[in-house]
Amino acid sequence: VLHNPLHFDRYRQLGTTTPRDYAALFARIAKGELVSREASAEMLAILRQQHYNTMLTHDFPQYYLDCEETGAPELIWVASKSGSMNACRNDGGIVHTPYGEYVIVLMNKDFHDIIEYNEHPAMVYGARVSRMILDQVLACEGRLSLS
């Protein structure tokens, strides 16, 4: 039973965004420019607790992400927000590395399989792209040029 159903015919723009807008939002949060620095830090802390970040982190080397056994700080952490609806799978966020942070946004649509699972083609594709970007950032020690 839905107590507050969404009537999509009334909300045609619900959930409408672009990768550029989503990336700009994360960049402003990372810089503390979206709201106050304190509120931005709280937002980052919440986004770091996101459990549904498979598209961004699935192919990352586990030793970068999990330092629970040693008590050492994580070498890489991700503050992200994912979303999906029907044939769309999206994820975006801030990836912190020893060489600095970068923003990544992956948006996929028009997949025939609308079921949510980690080996969904959109998740596999996104994880590979995310890993390629991480590898480049680490190989260049954070010195990437867009020129």
Where are these regions (language model features)?
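Structured C-terminal helix/loop/strand segments within mature extracytoplasmic catalytic/sensor domains
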Residues: 11-147
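Acidic/His-rich structured neighborhood in mature extracellular/periplasmic domains
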Residues: 1-9, 21
